[in-house]
C-alpha cells in the first residue's frame, strides 16, 4: 500500500511532541482529531489577513469573507454529494445539528401518540434530544436492539414500525464499537414505511466516502473537529423540501427577512433561517481546509489504509489474554476494550504515563455500557496519521500494565 504516511504525519505538528517523556501516541481521534498545518494556517490567515463580519457588509473585507464562507457551503455539499449547497446548514457540531432537527422538525411535525426509533448504540447526542422532545410532546421512543456482537438486529426494525412511527435516528458508525451500519438498506426500509431518517455521521465522514443522495436519508449530521477541522463547527444536511417546511429553532440576526414591532417577523429561506447570529467564520474556513486535505489524499485510500491498520491492531490486541474486545470484527475507527478487571480509568492513566493517549469512560453511550454490563471501557481510535508502531506501543503498554497489576 502506497499511502504516504510519513508525509501525512509531518503535516500534523502536534504529533511531534512528547508526553511524560515519551513520544506521543495519539489514539483519541474519535473524540477529536489533530489538525494538519493547512487547517491551522487557514484559520490564522483569515484572522490575520482577512477577518471581517459576514452578512450585510458592503466593504471589501466583509464581501470576501461572505464569498469564502458560501464557497465552503458549496464545498461541503460536494463533499457529501448533496443536491444543492442550500441543503447545508452551518452549526456548532453534531449535537447542535440533532437538537435543531428535534426542535424544528420534531416540534412542527410530531405530536402526542407518534413514535420515534433510535438504536441501543447511539451517542447521547442522538438520544437525549429525542427524550426531551418525547417528554414534552408525549411521543414514544422505541429502541432498536443489538446482537451480542454489537451489531443492529436487522430483522427487528420491521417490528418497531407501525402507523404511529414517524422518524428513525441512527448512527452510521458507532462511536464505541466501530460498527458500520448498513445505512443504505436501513434507510430504504424506513422510507418504504414513510419514515423520516436522520443519520449521525460524526464517526463516518473521516473514514469513508459519503453520498447522502445515494444513502437516501433526510438529514445527515457531522462535526468538523473529528474531520481534522476546527472545533465549534459542524454540518446539518437536510433535504431541501423538508428544510423549507421547517420553522427556525433560534431567533436573532441574519435569519430574518423582515422584523416589525407591529407586524412581527418573517424569516429567511433555508438554510439561512437556521443560522441565527454571527457564525464561526474562521471555523468554517478551517473546515474547508480540512475537506481539501482529506480530499487531496482521497477518502478511498484513507479507508483502505485505516482498514489495514485496524486489522493489524485487532490481531495484535487479541493476543493479550486478559483483554476483552467489544464489537464486531469488521469495524471503522475505534477499538473498545477492557483489561482484566481493572477499571478503564486506571488503564488509561498508566497508558498516559507511557505517552499513549486513549479515551476512557462511558463514551457518552451509557445505554451501550448497560448492554455490556460494564461501567466503562477503554477506547483506542485510529486515524489517517496512525501507524503500526503506534499499535505496537499500545500493545506493549497494555502488556506492561498486565504485568504490573496482575
Curated annotation (Swiss-Prot):
<dbReference type="InterPro" id="IPR000192">
    <property type="entry name" value="Aminotrans_V_dom"/>
</dbReference>
<keyword id="KW-0456">Lyase</keyword>
<dbReference type="InterPro" id="IPR015422">
    <property type="entry name" value="PyrdxlP-dep_Trfase_small"/>
</dbReference>
<dbReference type="GO" id="GO:0005737">
    <property type="term" value="C:cytoplasm"/>
</dbReference>
<feature type="modified residue" description="N6-(pyridoxal phosphate)lysine">
    <location>
        <position position="226"/>
    </location>
</feature>
<comment type="similarity">
    <text>Belongs to the class-V pyridoxal-phosphate-dependent aminotransferase family. Csd subfamily.</text>
</comment>
<dbReference type="InterPro" id="IPR010970">
    <property type="entry name" value="Cys_dSase_SufS"/>
</dbReference>
<keyword id="KW-0663">Pyridoxal phosphate</keyword>
<dbReference type="InterPro" id="IPR020578">
    <property type="entry name" value="Aminotrans_V_PyrdxlP_BS"/>
</dbReference>
<protein>
    <recommendedName>
        <fullName>Cysteine desulfurase</fullName>
        <ecNumber>2.8.1.7</ecNumber>
        <ecNumber>4.4.1.16</ecNumber>
    </recommendedName>
</protein>
<dbReference type="GO" id="GO:0009000">
    <property type="term" value="F:selenocysteine lyase activity"/>
</dbReference>
<dbReference type="GO" id="GO:0031071">
    <property type="term" value="F:cysteine desulfurase activity"/>
</dbReference>
<feature type="active site" description="Cysteine persulfide intermediate">
    <location>
        <position position="364"/>
    </location>
</feature>
<keyword id="KW-0808">Transferase</keyword>
<dbReference type="GO" id="GO:0006534">
    <property type="term" value="P:cysteine metabolic process"/>
</dbReference>
<comment type="pathway">
    <text>Cofactor biosynthesis; iron-sulfur cluster biosynthesis.</text>
</comment>
<dbReference type="InterPro" id="IPR015421">
    <property type="entry name" value="PyrdxlP-dep_Trfase_major"/>
</dbReference>
<dbReference type="InterPro" id="IPR015424">
    <property type="entry name" value="PyrdxlP-dep_Trfase"/>
</dbReference>
<comment type="function">
    <text>Cysteine desulfurases mobilize the sulfur from L-cysteine to yield L-alanine, an essential step in sulfur metabolism for biosynthesis of a variety of sulfur-containing biomolecules. Component of the suf operon, which is activated and required under specific conditions such as oxidative stress and iron limitation. Acts as a potent selenocysteine lyase in vitro, that mobilizes selenium from L-selenocysteine. Selenocysteine lyase activity is however unsure in vivo.</text>
</comment>
<comment type="subunit">
    <text>Homodimer. Interacts with SufE and the SufBCD complex composed of SufB, SufC and SufD. The interaction with SufE is required to mediate the direct transfer of the sulfur atom from the S-sulfanylcysteine.</text>
</comment>
<keyword id="KW-0963">Cytoplasm</keyword>
<dbReference type="Pfam" id="PF00266">
    <property type="entry name" value="Aminotran_5"/>
</dbReference>
<dbReference type="GO" id="GO:0030170">
    <property type="term" value="F:pyridoxal phosphate binding"/>
</dbReference>
Amino acid at each position: 500500500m502506497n499511502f504516504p504516511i510519513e508525509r501525512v504525519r509531518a503535516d500534523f505538528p502536534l504529533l511531534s511532541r512528547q508526553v511524560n517523556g515519551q513520544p506521543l501516541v495519539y489514539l483519541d481521534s474519535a473524540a477529536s482529531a489533530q489538525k494538519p498545518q493547512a487547517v491551522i494556517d487557514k484559520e490564522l490567515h483569515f484572522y490575520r489577513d482577512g477577518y471581517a463580519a459576514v452578512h450585510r457588509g458592503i466593504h471589501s473585507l466583509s464581501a470576501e469573507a461572505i464569498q469564502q464562507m458560501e464557497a465552503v457551503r458549496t464545498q461541503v455539499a460536494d463533499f457529501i454529494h448533496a443536491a444543492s449547497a442550500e441543503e447545508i446548514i452551518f452549526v456548532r457540531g453534531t449535537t447542535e445539528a440533532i437538537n435543531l432537527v428535534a426542535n424544528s422538525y420534531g416540534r412542527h411535525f410530531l405530536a402526542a401518540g407518534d413514535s420515534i426509533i433510535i438504536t441501543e448504540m447511539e451517542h447521547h447526542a442522538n438520544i437525549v434530544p429525542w427524550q426531551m422532545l418525547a417528554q414534552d410532546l408525549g411521543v414514544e421512543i422505541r429502541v432498536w436492539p443489538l446482537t451480542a456482537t454489537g451489531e443492529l438486529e436487522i430483522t427487528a426494525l420491521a417490528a418497531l414500525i407501525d402507523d404511529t412511527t414517524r422518524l428513525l435516528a441512527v448512527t452510521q458508525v458507532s462511536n464505541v464499537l466501530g460498527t458500520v451500519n448498513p445505512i443504505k438498506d436501513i434507510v430504504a426500509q424506513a422510507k418504504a414505511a414513510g419514515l423520516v431518517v436522520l443519520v449521525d455521521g460524526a464517526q463516518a465522514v473521516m473514514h469513508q466516502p459519503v453520498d447522502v443522495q445515494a444513502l437516501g436519508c433526510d438529514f445527515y449530521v457531522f462535526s468538523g473537529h473529528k474531520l481534522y477541522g476546527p472545533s465549534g463547527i459542524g454540518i446539518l444536511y437536510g433535504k431541501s423540501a423538508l428544510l423549507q417546511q421547517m420553522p427556525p429553532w433560534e431567533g436573532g440576526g441574519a435569519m430574518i427577512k423582515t422584523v416589525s414591532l407591529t407586524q412581527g417577523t418573517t424569516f429567511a429561506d433555508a438554510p439561512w433561517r437556521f443560522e441565527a447570529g454571527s457564525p464561526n467564520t474562521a471555523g468554517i474556513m478551517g473546515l474547508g481546509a480540512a475537506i481539501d486535505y482529506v480530499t487531496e489524499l482521497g477518502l478511498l485510500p484513507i479507508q483502505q489504509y485505516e482498514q489495514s491498520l485496524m486489522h493489524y491492531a485487532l490481531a495484535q490486541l487479541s493476543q493479550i489474554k486478559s483483554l476483552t474486545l467489544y464489537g464486531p470484527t469488521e469495524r471503522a475507527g475505534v477499538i473498545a476494550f477492557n483489561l482484566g478487571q481493572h477499571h478503564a480509568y486506571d488503564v488509561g492513566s498508566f497508558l498516559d504515563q507511557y505517552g499513549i493517549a486513549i479515551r476512557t469512560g462511558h463514551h457518552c453511550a451509557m445505554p451501550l455500557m448497560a448492554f455490556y454490563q460494564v461501567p466503562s471501557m477503554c477506547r483506542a481510535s485510529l486515524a489517517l496519521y496512525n501507524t503500526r508502531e503506534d499499535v505496537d506501543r499500545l500493545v506493549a503498554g497494555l502488556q506492561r500494565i498486565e504485568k504490573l497489576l496482575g
